[in-house]
């Protein structure tokens, strides 16, 4: 096993190896070990990359067996680390070595995502003295037997994304709705452009709600629902982002937008086909009680939980 090697950039071969590593872990654990943003960052120098090379049992003698991605500090938010170890290179201390290297680099100020909160991640966190500081719930429901009608919101019209002319308002509402959020807040044209470039992006699945009853700012954007169809998982759609302008909250707009998007996903994924069994998923902060209750009313139940771990403040 090689020593941990920090990089600002990865060459194309290393990027392929990391993607193969993530794919192997996803297949073995039935949950992706890192978020989609980590994969998006592989070709950029905006985050730091940590590689460990070694042998894979029954396979290559010099492969990337461990990888960690570390975000830079941003707006007083702690740095976030996400890591993965090859299934056939586990129980060698690779995960602990990656985590210790990140803690040493940040002065123990970073957090670690444990996607799916699997037992090996819990054990590693406990061994390193880390405690849960954040939980992100994945909720799911069948796209069959949806409510017959979408709740209407007076004075609001909903249409789909019409192109870059909508971007300024979309960014305004997103950043107002998620001002507190470490991943979703603070978006710029760069974040929008990257997501439009994703193969799953479909403007017909991005719904915008405009207000028609505001005399000062007629037609302003009040909220949006961005859906996603998982091309690598047939039959799976996602409530990717639902954002409502804080000035428009309390009107049922979030529930209405969610319902509109879910209906579209049901049609898109063939819920009317007796042979199909499509599902919709979403992520929500576990402590966002209002949002969790809204999704429960729409028929969602908890599927899995991602946990962020960190050194307890008293020990930091």
Curated annotation (Swiss-Prot):
CDD domains: NAT_SF. Pfam families: Acetyltransf_1. Acetyl-CoA 1 binds at residues 83-85, 91-96. SUPFAM superfamilies: Acyl-CoA N-acyltransferases (Nat). PROSITE patterns: GNAT. 1D-myo-inositol 2-(L-cysteinylamino)-2-deoxy-alpha-D-glucopyranoside binds at residues 36, 183, 228, 238, 283. Its EC number is 2.3.1.189. Acetyl-CoA 2 binds at residues 242-244, 249-255, 288-293. One of its GO terms (molecular function) is mycothiol synthase activity. Keywords: Acyltransferase, Repeat, Transferase. The keyword Mitochondrion does not apply. It catalyses: 1D-myo-inositol 2-(L-cysteinylamino)-2-deoxy-alpha-D-glucopyranoside + acetyl-CoA = mycothiol + CoA + H(+). Residues 16-153, 156-316 form the N-acetyltransferase domain. One of its GO terms (biological process) is mycothiol biosynthetic process. Catalyzes the transfer of acetyl from acetyl-CoA to desacetylmycothiol (Cys-GlcN-Ins) to form mycothiol. NCBIfam families: mycothiol_MshD (TIGR03448). Belongs to the acetyltransferase family. MshD subfamily. Monomer. This is Mycothiol acetyltransferase. It comes from Mycolicibacterium paratuberculosis (strain ATCC BAA-968 / K-10).
């Amino acid at each position: 096993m090689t020593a941990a090697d920090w990089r600002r950039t990865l060459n194309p071969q290393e990027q392929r190896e990391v993607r193969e590593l993530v794919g192997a872990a996803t297949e073995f654990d039935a949950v992706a070990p890192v978020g989609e943003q980590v994969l998006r960052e592989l070709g950029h120098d905006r985050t730091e990359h940590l590689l460990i090379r070694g042998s894979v049992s029954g396979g290559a003698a010099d492969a990337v067996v461990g990888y960690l991605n570390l975000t830079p500090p941003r707006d007083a938010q702690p740095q976030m680390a996400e890591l993965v170890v090859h299934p056939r290179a586990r129980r060698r201390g690779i995960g602990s070595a990656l985590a210790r290297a990140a803690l040493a680099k940040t002065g123990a100020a970073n957090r670690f995502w444990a996607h799916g909160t699997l037992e090996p991640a819990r054990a590693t966190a406990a061994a390193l003295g880390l405690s849960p500081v954040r939980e992100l719930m994945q909720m799911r429901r069948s796209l069959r037997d949806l409510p017959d009608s979408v709740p209407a919101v007076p004075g609001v019209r909903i249409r789909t994304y019409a192109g870059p002319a909508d971007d300024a308002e979309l960014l305004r509402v997103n950043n107002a709705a998620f001002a507190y959020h470490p991943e979703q807040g603070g978006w710029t044209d760069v974040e929008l452009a990257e997501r439009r470039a994703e193969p799953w992006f479909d403007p017909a699945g991005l719904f915008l709600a405009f207000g028609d009853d505001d005399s000062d700012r007629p037609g302003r954007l009040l909220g949006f629902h961005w859906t996603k169809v998982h091309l690598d998982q047939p039959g799976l759609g996602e409530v990717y982002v639902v954002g409502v302008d804080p000035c428009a909250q309390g009107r049922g707009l979030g529930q209405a937008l969610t319902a509109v998007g879910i209906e579209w996903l049901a049609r898109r994924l063939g819920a009317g086909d007796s042979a199909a069994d499509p599902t919709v998923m979403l992520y929500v902060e576990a402590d966002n009680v209002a949002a969790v209750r809204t999704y429960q009313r729409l028929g969602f139940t908890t599927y899995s939980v991602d946990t962020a771990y960190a050194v307890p403040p008293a020990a930091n």
